[in-house]
Each structure stands twice: as structure tokens, then as C-alpha cells.
Amino acid sequence: MKAEIPITWAEVVDSTNSWASREMSVIDKMSVFAALYQTAGRGQRGNKWHSATGENLTFSIALRFGNSLTGNVRAMDQFVLTEVAALSVADFLSDKGADVRIKWPNDIYVRDRKICGMLIENSLRGDEVATSIVGIGINLNQRDFPAELANPTSLAIATGKEIGPKEALEDFLPFFLMRLEMSLTTEGRAEMRNDYLDILYRKDKPFPYRDNVTGEEFTGTIKGISDIGELLAEMPDKSIKSFSFKEIGYII
């Protein structure tokens, strides 16, 4: 897919997702908003996203659906946007030499350490996704992290290679556009699901988890994901249980 995607860079913003949200009304198909530093970067579950100034890649992709570039996404199929985002980052990092896995739903890990986090915010119109803001933070060159971050890593730590944020974004976007194009067809979506499962973190091996609904800890085995993107885990009694976002915690 060849497309000219508008990219706007800022030295400092509150958060790229908030910035993209403020600009959404004038976005036709797709635009990218990137910053060298965020004063209030946001992650999943309301967590703050930490990134040293200029050392990492923090950006948001704003998408409007119902056109030739983005296609149409039913609300019940919106997990495909998670697959597009996670796989495109995995493609980019793999191309740079990192051995990555996707920690459900969309964190990217190198071994047991987090190299990328995402915050995807969708708005619906009826039973269709109207817009999506895909916020992505990739640790590129940072080597020293705050002590409160439990398990961070970066491309520099994982591979010994450094790359500037602007160059990294230019290198990343073709992977995103390729995965977005795959999402336009049934065959492409099926291929993406297989690609996602192929690099799903901890798949088919027993590990400790926490049921965040009951508070109980258990040893389970991730078997895959459901049609709507729930995590499927084999429980100690060999039954298969589905978990929605925030319902399961990884004990690492």
C-alpha cells in the first residue's frame, strides 16, 4: 500500500493521543502525531507512560474509517486494530534485529522485558468503528529507566543498535500500512491472526497468572485468543477459560 501519510512532530506535548484526539475532526483518513517528549503520556489502565526526552519513539496514529485506506471495521471485530498495531511494531523491531513476542493484548516483549506499550482508543458509530487513535511508545535508545518500572528494555539494550526517533518512525510506517492493508480482506485478517498467535508471549507453556476478578493465582497455559480477542487459557483443571482485557494478570 502506497500512501502519503501526514506526519506532524512536536518537541513537547501533553500526550500524543490527546493531541491526536484534538485534531481528529479535521483528519480525512490517517495522520500521525509524534513528539520527542510527553508531559502526560498515557498507557493502559490509566498508567503514565515514561520516556526520556528524544531517546524513544512516542507517537499516535489517528484513523478515520469508511474509506479506501482504512476500510470498514465492525465494532465486534475491533480487535483487528490491535493485531494491526502489535504486528506492525513486531515487524519493525524484528527487522531491526530484536527477538520479540506480543504479550496479549498489545505489549511487545523481548524475553520477559517490555520494549513497547500501546493505548488504542476507538470511537463507535452504531455497530461500526468510526475512528481510532493508536498510541505507541517504543523504547529505542534509553538504557537507564526509573526504578518503579518493573521490567523495561529498549532496542539499544536488546540489539546494541541505536536509531533516532524520526528515522524509526519513517521505517515503521511501511509495516503499519502493510498490516492495515491486510486488514481489508478476510484472507488478510486470517493471516494476521496466525502471525499474532505465532509470536504470542507464553503460548503453550504453563506459567503463573492472577485472576484479577477473583484475586486467585493459578498456573495456566495460554492456548490462543477468541474471535473477539479474548485470551484463552487452559486452567489447572484442564478447562479453557476466556479472559477479557484487565481480567488476567501476568506474574513475571
Regions found by a protein language model. Give the residues of each.
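N-terminal lobe of the biotin/lipoate ligase/transferase fold
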Residues: 1-94, 116
